[in-house]
């Protein structure tokens, strides 16, 4: 049986937690158009990492077979 391919775009965006049971992602809306956003929004709310929702976790794991 051939090796499973990893989706490279997903590999750059997601990584497992230390235990490997959950998946971490970066929050959106912090790349550009930041002038009108408040400091609180940029630093406190958007800087933290977030967990992938349970409903999406299965799809992410299918894209990353060796995670």
Curated annotation (Swiss-Prot):
InterPro entries, per the entry: Ribosomal_bL35, Ribosomal_bL35-like, Ribosomal_bL35_CS, Ribosomal_bL35_sf
Family from the record: Belongs to the bacterial ribosomal protein bL35 family.
Pfam families xrefs: Ribosomal_L35p (PF01632)
GO biological process, one term: translation
Disulfide cross-links: none
UniProt keyword terms in alphabetical order: Ribonucleoprotein, Ribosomal protein
Gene: rpmI
Molecular functions (GO terms): structural constituent of ribosome
Highest rank taxon of the organism: Bacteria
Stored PANTHER family: 54S RIBOSOMAL PROTEIN BL35M, LARGE RIBOSOMAL SUBUNIT PROTEIN BL35M
Matches recorded under Gene3D superfamilies: 4.10.410.60
Protein name in UniProt: Large ribosomal subunit protein bL35
GO CC field: cytosolic large ribosomal subunit
């Amino acid at each position: 049986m051939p090796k499973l391919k990893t989706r490279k775009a997903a590999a750059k965006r997601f990584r497992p937690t230390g235990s490997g049971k959950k998946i971490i992602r970066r929050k959106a809306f912090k790349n550009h158009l930041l002038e009108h956003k408040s400091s609180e929004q940029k630093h406190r709310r958007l800087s933290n990492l977030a967990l992938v929702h349970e409903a999406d976790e299965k799809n992410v794991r299918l894209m990353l077979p060796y995670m």
